[in-house]
């Protein structure tokens, strides 16, 4: 053996051909700081081998390299800008040395080669991939851009257009797609990968393949005429502005960096990449997006730990068809758990099956499935008007009308029709689980399972623990939600649970602004364009349904009278009384018309202004800053209360529930990350400025305590060691 590090080793394969094998402890290879340093040590050894004729890079794992070690990012990005720049310069010098070896190099790619793994691949002369390989640069999804030469080598290898598409969108592509654009030289069966790699290297050694000619374009300026460059970069910038917008600077920075480096050789282009990377890495957007990635891993890890000894349900049932029931049935069947769908109404059953069929047909149209798969999934959804087959159900979810009397009657009846060990869950959005459990003989087998609409798109499922819910019940439901491809987050019981409990104070802030003379159109614009919500509050209420919100608002007011009981008639009341229920009947805050695809399109409707005038003071101007503060303080305060009361277990789970359940802008990272970014002391000052507006604006005790020493909610991340102490030599 020529060299053995902790995460890779170097060996002779055959006469003159060495292999560099990535083999980190654990299940996957990551390109962390230690591996970059170890790669440098391996190159020290290789550069001294006078009889070296070629180098093969491969992985001992099921994937080549899954990317950088993202757990290092938060601390690495905390180091001073100059030190981070120095470390990047060191890392790039390692990849340059790999690229500059005086012999042909080839990378044998199996599984994932993402981020730094892809950048390692790009430094070699030839690339072979197995059919399951996926190669790409997802950095912009984390608020950064490639930092190990990806923005330099990929455009020179593929051409500007293909490279810009991959880098700006943070895409990874299949082996076949990589072959088509020239990212790999061939796709070979896994069992033939090493054999094919050695054959290609021998051809390069013998001069049949010109490896030096393959390498040269990566060292030179991008081969683009002035007209081609103008077209490529203008189109790319336009697309990025349309898709990413101003809140996500990484994609635009990457495009502009590639454009600025187009006329430069490798080393000058890498210096530009370094210069662009460092400010992105130290931005609040990167901190938030990396935080979301880490929180997502944490939440998924909790679910995995919780269900370690739990068998995934083999048969499910849904009570109540229609859009929601049909969506749940589709998702369960699509992910491989057969489902019985019961309703008392034939029409509703037809609607439920129709909803599932519609979603499957969309998959068929997109080429994701064939007719056989479609028929197979539909065959596992069994519509019924009675309880036939319910004795087989491991888990049943009730999705009937949001009325406690109806739900209690249905739940009590269902309990008599299922096995004693069957878990029953309610898809209620606001009614306390312990209240619904009061009619059950086996309340320990009952919990809440709150899906979000549309079920097939929304990743979150709130799993609600009632007073008597057992751990086994929670584990069973979490297991089913995970099997359905959802992110389950366990919360404790209260009116509205977590997501709706924190959403309605946000709506209350909106109602108060309207009462005080604000224009709902301006509020929507500010909350969408400035704060970054996918929908402003007026538009969101129209989508949720004014009637639904009116009912839920009453439930929340009864549950939290001190804060959520209002003493005035608000905009939601006015629209509800006027029969303006939102998208469902074509008029709410806005009017709705069907577009060419049959989807509701928002259009202005001046008639609403006279209705709102009845419950509002005369119109007056509000600054964008005041609108954001008055909208967000009630929500953030309630989020903090939920943590303090143990409704939600951690800031990470709270932030993921907000991002996945409500569409909280990812570049803010969630309520706790947003609060930490401002600083708890500054946030408290803002809240106190508005506390005259009522109890929703009064900061909770725990927050006031944190603000007294400006403490964050997330653990303080210490900067990584200075670069001189990082493993750079």
UniProtKB/Swiss-Prot annotation:
Q: Which reaction does it catalyse?
A: a (3S)-3-hydroxyacyl-CoA + NAD(+) = a 3-oxoacyl-CoA + NADH + H(+); a (3S)-3-hydroxyacyl-CoA = a (2E)-enoyl-CoA + H2O; a 4-saturated-(3S)-3-hydroxyacyl-CoA = a (3E)-enoyl-CoA + H2O; (3S)-3-hydroxybutanoyl-CoA = (3R)-3-hydroxybutanoyl-CoA
- Its gene is fadB
A GO MF term = delta(3)-delta(2)-enoyl-CoA isomerase activity
Q: Where is this region: Disordered?
A: 708-729
State the UniProt keywords alphabetically. Fatty acid metabolism, Isomerase, Lipid degradation, Lipid metabolism, Lyase, Multifunctional enzyme, NAD, Oxidoreductase
The answer on whether this UniProt entry bears the keyword NADP reads no
What name does the UniProt record give this protein? Fatty acid oxidation complex subunit alpha
The role this protein plays is: Involved in the aerobic and anaerobic degradation of long-chain fatty acids via beta-oxidation cycle. Catalyzes the formation of 3-oxoacyl-CoA from enoyl-CoA via L-3-hydroxyacyl-CoA. It can also use D-3-hydroxyacyl-CoA and cis-3-enoyl-CoA as substrate.
The root-end lineage is: Bacteria, Pseudomonadati, Pseudomonadota, Gammaproteobacteria, Enterobacterales
